[in-house]
Amino acid sequence: LTQEEQANVIRAFVKSVDDKLPIIAGITGEGTEVAALEAKRAVAAGASAGLLYPSHGWLRFGYQDGAPQDRYRVVYEESGLPLILFQYPDVTKATYNLKTLLDISAQPGVFAMKNGVRNMRRWDTEIPVIRRERPDLQILSCHDEYLLHTAFDVDGFLVGYGNIAPEPLIEMIKAGKAGDYVKARQLHDRLLPVTKSVYHRGSHMEGTVALKHALVARGILEHATVRSPLLPLENGAEKEIHDAMRAAELGRVG
C-alpha cells in the first residue's frame, strides 16, 4: 500500500468499529526514523497501537547488538504509539535472541509480544523465562500453523488466521487458557483442512493469497485480487480452499 492508502485503511477500520475495538497498525518502514514517521501517520489516522516489524535488511544480514532496542525506543518516543514486539522466525537473521526480547519488553511503550519464532525448542525454553521476567507482558502467538502447540502458553493469537476463522480460534484460546487439551485438539482437527489449504504451501506468502480466497468463501471479500509481488495461486487452489472452509463449517457471514 502507498502511505496514503495505509492511512485510509486505518481510518476505515477505526470508523467501522465505532471505537469499540482497538485498531493495530503494522509499522514496517526500513529505517528507524522512517518507521517513526510511519507510526506518527498511524496515530494521526486513529491507530491505538502498532506492531513494529524488524528492519528487513536484518533478514539477510543480521543486526548489531542494541539496534532493535533502539528502533523500539525511537519509534515510541517520537510517535507515542504503544508498540507490540514482533519476534520473527528462527530461520531468519532478524529473529531476536532472548536478551534482546527481554530488553525490548522492558522498554516504555512496549505492552505485548507477537511471537512467531517457529522453533518449538526456543518456544518451550524462552516463553517461560519471558513470563517470569515480564509478567505484565501480553504474549500472543503468531504461529498460524502451530496454534495447538502454542495455545496453552499465551494470552491470545495475533495471526492472519483470525481473519477467516475467528470463532473457532477464540474457542481455542479459551481451551488453551483452561488447559483443555481435548477441546483444543478437536478444534485443531476441525480446522486442519483449512490450515493445510492456506498455510501448508510452498511459500508462506502464498498463504496471504490463500487467505483472500478464504475471505471470499466467507462472503467478506468479493474477489481475491492481489498486487505484485504477490501472484495468483495455481488453478484449482480456489476450489480447494472453498472446500476446506466448508469442511471446517466456516460458512458465509452477514
Task: Explain the meaning of each model-derived region.
Residues 1-95, 231, 251:
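Active-site beta->alpha loop and helix N-cap motifs at the rims of alpha/beta catalytic domains
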Residues 6, 10, 35, 72, ...:
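A general structural signal for well-ordered alpha-helical segments in protein cores
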Residues 38, 100, 145-146, 211, ...:
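Residues within well-ordered alpha-helices
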Residues 74-78, 89-195, 199, 203:
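Catalytic alpha/beta core domains of metabolic enzymes, predominantly
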Residues 153, 168-254:
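C-terminal alpha-helical cap/extension of soluble enzyme domains
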